[in-house]
A protein has these predicted regions:
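A contiguous, basic/glycine-rich beta-loop/short-helix subdomain that forms a polymer-engagement track
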Residues: 185-218, 228-237, 365-506, 517, ...
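Signature of the SF2 helicase/ATPase Hel1-core->accessory helical subdomain module
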Residues: 64, 70, 90, 94-98, ...
């Protein structure tokens, strides 16, 4: 469809009307350029897909919503906006779209949050109830759904009252009633514990109400994981050809796609034996109490026992082989170089993939049959078996996926990283097997780039080292396929609004010097805090270990510090805002992930402290396998893998400071390698243009280094 004059006029009229709705609206050339580029791509006038980097301040959300809605209406398609985190998803759903509804008549929109963000009305009813009969019923259903105390029961009763009276939509983030993580875990549910259409609360369930609204909506706000799953299953969202898709925070997309090529599962022989025995008993119960019209051949007791026995023998053999590869210590790990399994192990994995897939199919068949029997059997007994079969299905789905991945030699032309771990919990030894694909371009091509006619990939940061090369390699987007790559200018004057400070550190932030380097960092930080020049500060670390060492040096300042992990992130940010607004000093402290999406303007944040250049962890099995593969292709892992990742992280961290025309301040980076190493200049050149200062560091009294207890990473 061409971008007609009428469509251009409609987009222009909405943009003009928007300016009347926003106080102190500042027209920006980059925003107008983005609206035009998005419109041309979605209308099919310019290329296949568009990757557009829109720095903070451009107003990217409204820049894709306005043309997206106009073209969706013209073509009778659904605009799907996908984000990577709940905060941005909720901002678009609760703030941006309601604003646009004021200027766009009858705009229909909804949000598709993950199941875990919604309350389960069945669980809420149980936790809000004071009736012993209700608790007895749930105990029979194997659910741990009793309030811990009377206060918790009253809180749940208030939540239930709000839900029943439509004051609350069931989303965790949309209630003012405090819900701690432990309580929410019992209030929400997952796929394995959901009764779906068999549930008494199905019609009013917030999760399923939201899913039904998708069919009527013009705009659906989703997340990347849901979009990928929907494209795979062809469910939830409209057909790909009837979509206009915007992937906001698009730099996360390769990592989300990688989740489809990532699996870790326990494979300990005793644990496996228990799961198989429980499943055999469950099948026997189904045949005895809820016999299907046609009994699946594999459900025959003798055949099923033989099938499970073969499965157990293979798992037992694999346990023995993996234990030989792993060191003799109780806790151990073995990674297979280049993801290449020995022939014997590969044969076992291929057979396990087939056997577990057959059990997955059997569990699914029984589950479908059980779901049709709700009108003819004791509902409580039936629901108990449905829940148990649901959990068995989830377990076999995970195992089937694990062994399918293990059986792959390559994915998207690159190895699949594979490793085994042994760990001790409660005195018991557990064996785990892990698989992660290191490239996902083929999956993205199949599910997205080839399926949806036109897609917008956007973020404040898409490039690293001033190049789209890393994004192209990881995502599979390419110019020769008709994809366009655009980097918009920032609307801010960074030279006037801020500066970069690189203190004159004696030590580089290497592991051997970590204690001395952090002591220097703490001394400079203390000096800055005591100067009282900055009310709102943020300190970011590359590792939890370094953060804890830093905190040991500033124990006397602990009341000023709001540290990641002390409380949920949103509560820390709320408290920080409150402190600074009241004229107090406040310091947020966390890992680099803590800062993503953090939007603190003006005096709320005027000084950002960055511990060091955040290179990828060198001990990650995935990073090591990728490095081996790159070397086998005569490519330099540091240039292809480590440096672009470090550049991206640094751009994200520095980007926390200047969020509006009224922002000011400085970014302190405690890493002299930016000035002494050849790559340092390249990292600095990829940042906004700030003046650079190099102040002296106060004298430090170094504490004696305590031997850290060895820690072992379970996952990448």
């Amino acid at each position: 469809m061409a971008l007609t004059a009428a469509l251009k006029a409609q987009i222009g009229a909405w943009y003009k009307a928007l300016q009347q709705q926003i106080p102190d609206f500042i027209p920006r050339a980059p925003q107008r350029q983005m609206i035009a580029d998005v419109a041309k791509t979605l209308a099919g006038d310019d290329g296949r897909h568009l990757a557009i980097e829109a720095p903070t301040g451009v107003g990217k959300t409204l820049s894709y919503l306005i043309p997206g809605i106009a073209i969706a209406r013209e073509e009778d398609k659904t605009l799907v906006v996908s984000t990577a985190n709940v905060a941005l998803q909720d901002q678009i759903y609760s703030k941006d779209l309601p604003l646009l509804r004021k200027i766009i008549p009858d705009l229909r929109f909804t949000a598709a949050f993950g199941r875990g963000r919604y309350v389960c009305p069945r669980n809420l009813a149980a936790l809000a109830s004071t009736e012993p009969n209700q608790q007895d019923l749930l105990a029979f259903l194997d659910d741990d759904l009793t309030p811990n105390n009377q206060e918790e029961q009253k809180r749940c009763a208030r939540l239930k009252g709000d839900l029943d009276s439509y004051k609350w939509d069931g989303l965790r983030d949309h209630t003012d009633i405090a819900i701690d993580d432990g309580l929410w875990q019992r209030l929400s549910t997952d796929k394995a514990s959901c009764l779906n259409r068999n549930c008494h609360y199905y019609r009013e369930c917030p999760f399923f109400v939201a899913r039904r609204e998708i069919q009527e909506a013009e705009v659906v706000v989703a997340n990347h994981a849901l979009v990928m799953a929907a494209m795979e299953s062809e469910a939830v969202l409209p057909e790909p050809k009837n979509l206009l898709l915007v992937l906001d925070e698009g730099h996360h997309l390769p990592d989300v796609a990688r989740d489809a090529l990532e699996m870790s599962a326990e494979i300990s022989a005793p644990w496996y034996r228990l799961q198989l025995d429980l499943f055999c008993k469950l099948v026997a119960t189904c045949l005895e109490q809820f016999r299907p019209k046609t009994t699946p051949p594999l459900a025959n007791a003798e055949r099923l026992n033989g099938h499970c026995e073969e499965l157990y023998e293979l798992i037992s053999s694999l346990n023995n082989i993996l234990n030989l590869y792993m060191p003799a210590t109780q806790e151990a790990e073995h990674r297979f170089a280049m993801g290449e399994l020995p022939a014997e192990v590969m044969e076992i994995c291929q057979r396990l993939a087939k056997l577990t897939e057959m059990l997955r199919g059997l569990a699914e068949l029984f589950l479908n049959d059980l779901s049709e029997k709700t009108g003819t059997h004791d509902i409580v007994r039936l629901h108990r078996v449905i829940l148990q079969m649901n959990r068995a299905l989830g377990m076999f789905e995970a195992q089937s996926k694990l062994w399918r991945l293990a059986s792959l030699a390559q994915s998207s032309g690159a190895p699949v990283s594979k490793w085994a771990t042994r760990e001790v919990r409660d005195g018991q030894i557990h064996i785990w097997f892990h698989c992660v694909g290191i490239r996902v371009s083929d999956q993205l091509e199949r599910l997205l780039w080839r399926s949806v006619p036109h897609i917008i990939v956007t973020s404040a940061t898409l490039r690293s080292l001033n190049s789209f090369s890393r994004l192209q390699e990881m995502s599979g987007l390419k110019e020769k396929a008709g994809d366009r790559f655009v980097a918009l200018d920032s609307p801010f004057n960074h030279v006037e609004q801020g500066k970069i400070v690189i203190p004159q550190m004696r030590y580089e932030p290497l592991i051997d010097n970590e204690e001395q380097h952090i002591a220097e960092m703490a001394a400079y930080f203390r000096e800055q805090l005591e100067s009282k020049k900055h009310q709102g500060m943020l300190v970011l670390f590359a590792s939890g270990r370094a953060m804890q060492r830093f905190l040991e040096h500033v124990t006397d300042l602990r009341l000023l510090l709001l540290v990641q992990g002390d409380q949920p992130r949103y509560r820390l940010v709320e408290l920080h805002r409150k402190r600074v607004t009241n004229g107090e000093r406040s310091v947020l402290v966390g890992l680099q992930s803590f800062a993503e999406g953090l939007d603190l303007k003006g005096d709320l944040l005027t000084q950002v402290h960055i511990h060091k250049i955040a290179f990828p962890p060198i001990d990650s099995p995935v990073v090591i396998t990728e490095g081996e593969w790159l070397k086998s292709l005569n490519r330099y892992p540091f240039e292809v893998q480590s440096l672009p990742a470090a550049s991206f992280n640094l751009i994200q961290q520095v980007g926390r400071l200047i969020r509006s025309h009224g922002c000011w301040g400085e970014v302190v980076i405690y890493d002299k390698r930016l000035l002494t190493k050849n790559y340092g200049k390249r990292l600095l050149n990829a940042l906004p243009i700030f003046p650079i200062e190099q102040p002296a560091v106060p004298d430090v009294i170094v504490k004696p280094k305590e031997k850290a207890k060895p820690t072992r990473r379970r996952r990448r």
